């Protein structure tokens, strides 16, 4: 069945949107993004996206010849959350959001909550159902819940999936092949954990993956999301833990990504003295914005819960903590107390740790932090008055 104009209306629950706007929707990926759904007996896909400044949004793809406006979304909250159900769409269909900005421009954006993406040079999102994978790591998970996370021995092997080892023709191994190659080596060398340089979707093949455009999608360069689940499952079966680099500090300016998502700052801090890392050419998340907190914390929990990742190595924490990081005098503004600390980022990191470790005390939170800021990886308890 070819997708047609939306003809089936659904009533979205108010609770996910309310929690999202409060900064407390820790599983926002279950609501936002593209999800298989059946309405009035017709299977299709429901799309939801947050775009507070957009004048109009439509879903475009091969199914409608990428024609703007042919499948318009509507606001479910009268404010900033848009939805559309399209009958007949199916898994692996490619799509983007065509956003009409307040300036009258059309911008084509990948889905911030997409579970799967096209490979370079294309950058569209793909409909994907992450449910139904048969995990076999119950014994590993049970053992981890009894482990001494703080004091237990660890020997970590850091690696980049795409360049660790190449096969004939100078091609990287896919997730399945990589697991088969990696496990004997890690076992022989006596490592307890593998730490993966970022495997969240990113645009440039030649990079290490630190400029993330897909915070809920393992890079499709090496397979599907379930292929990556299988990779983790195989390592757990061999007694090897999996830690992944997670990048909440900044994101790139690629036009299809989060940057100026609806024509104006949404995910980035709107203050130019706080919202950009000029040396890196990237944008800084608006850590004080509730919707951004929901987005990032949902991403962290997504990898730990849906992919059974054992821990997160949080990248570039120092750049989050200090307003003057890599900035000269006059290029930054002090906080409300006159200091250089980014108070919103400090509060966010506390909230992140408390949420993750409150739900999963056996998971690892590891910070790349070069200034010896205390307690950046632990549960935070407010000091007694």
Where are the language model's segments positioned?
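The feature marks proteins involved in alpha-glucan
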Residues: 1-42, 74-158, 163-170, 177
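Structural beta-strand segments of beta-rich domains
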Residues: 43-47
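Short proline/glycine-enriched turn/loop motifs at strand-loop junctions of beta-rich domains
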Residues: 50-56
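Beta-strand signatures of extracellular beta-sandwich domains
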Residues: 58-60
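Substrate-binding/active-site clefts of carbohydrate-active enzymes
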Residues: 118, 138-151, 160-341
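Aromatic-lined carbohydrate-recognition surfaces of secreted/lumenal glycan-active proteins
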Residues: 347-353, 357-373
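Conserved small/polar residues in nucleotide/adenosyl-binding loops
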Residues: 380-385
């Amino acid at each position: 069945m070819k997708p047609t104009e939306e003809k089936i209306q659904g009533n979205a629950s108010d609770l996910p949107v309310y929690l999202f706007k409060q900064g407390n929707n820790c599983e926002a990926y279950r609501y936002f993004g593209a999800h298989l759904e059946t309405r009035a007996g017709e299977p299709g896909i429901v799309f939801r996206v947050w775009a507070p400044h957009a004048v109009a949004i439509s879903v475009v793809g091969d199914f409608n010849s990428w024609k703007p406006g042919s499948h318009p979304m509507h606001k479910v909250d009268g404010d900033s959350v848009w939805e559309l159900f399209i009958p007949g769409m199916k898994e692996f269909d490619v799509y983007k959001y065509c956003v009409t900005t307040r300036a009258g421009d059309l911008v084509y954006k990948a889905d911030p909550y997409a579970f799967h993406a096209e490979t370079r040079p294309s950058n569209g999102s793909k409909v994907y159902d992450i449910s139904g994978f048969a995990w076999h790591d119950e014994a590993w998970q049970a053992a981890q819940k009894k482990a001494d996370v703080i004091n237990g021995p660890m020997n970590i092997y850091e690696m980049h999936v795409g360049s660790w080892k190449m096969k004939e023709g100078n091609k990287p191994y896919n997730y399945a092949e990589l697991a088969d190659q990696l496990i004997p080596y890690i076992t022989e060398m006596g490592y307890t954990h593998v730490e993966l340089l970022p495997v969240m979707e990113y645009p440039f093949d030649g990079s290490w993956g630190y400029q993330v455009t897909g915070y809920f999608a393992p890079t499709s360069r090496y397979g599907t999301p379930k292929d990556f689940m299988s990779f983790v499952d195989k390592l757990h079966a061999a007694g090897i833990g999996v830690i992944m680099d997670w990048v909440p500090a900044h994101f790139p300016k690629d036009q299809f990504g989060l940057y100026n998502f609806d024509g104006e700052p949404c995910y980035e801090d709107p203050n130019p003295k706080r919202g950009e890392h000029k040396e890196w050419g990237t944008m800084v998340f608006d850590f004080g914005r509730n919707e951004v907190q929901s987005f990032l914390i949902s991403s962290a929990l997504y990898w730990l819960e849906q992919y059974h990742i054992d821990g997160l190595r949080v990248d570039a924490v120092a750049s989050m903590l200090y307003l003057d990081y890599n900035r000269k005098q006059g290029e930054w503004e002090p906080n409300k107390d006159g200091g250089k600390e980014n108070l919103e980022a400090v509060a966010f990191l506390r909230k992140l740790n408390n949420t993750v470790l409150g739900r999963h005390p056996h998971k690892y939170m590891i910070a790349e932090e070069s200034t010896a800021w205390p307690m950046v990886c632990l549960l935070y308890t407010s000091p007694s008055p």
